[in-house]
Amino acid sequence: MTFIITTPPAVEPVTLDDARAQVRVASVQEDELLTRLIGAARQHVERTIRRALITQGWRLYLDDWPPGRVVRLPVTPVQAVTSVTVFDAEGMPVALDAADYDLDGISAPARLKVKAGAGASSRSLNGIEIELTAGYGDAGEDVPAPLRQAILLLVAHWFEHREAGIDAATASIPFGFDALVAGYRVPRL
């Protein structure tokens, strides 16, 4: 199973003003660094908990349907499955009808159940593509407050420890981070 992001989030869960307040910097001199740190912190939180925070597009590639034709989706919360495509004997894409599959977006990880007889692929590798939209919503306010706070905690920590040195290895994740994200972790597939 391979999955890639096709449409990155349009905004970050926290604003530059939020980050400035967290690191107690009033000037705009550090804005470029803070912007990079916000993006890196969001990505770190997303990888840690296996969730998309802000609405984003994903594509999942499968060689074949798993047993029971139930696909455990690698990112959650899933807002919608936008398409399921298989490839015929000539290598041409064939889109499945939405009635051929059901999304369980409540489970974590989310699951996609494909009905028996729907869409077998003739390709031996990456013959199935699933396009989906995931995330809590389009705005930072849609993201749960503990996850936004975890991002700000990382931003402040990395801002303070931005110089590589002896202490950098022991100071990679700040105290309190794990407690903020613990309730949002999705078990590994």
Task: Show which residues each predicted segment covers.
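Divalent metal-cofactor coordination and adjacent catalytic microenvironments
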Residues: M1-L189
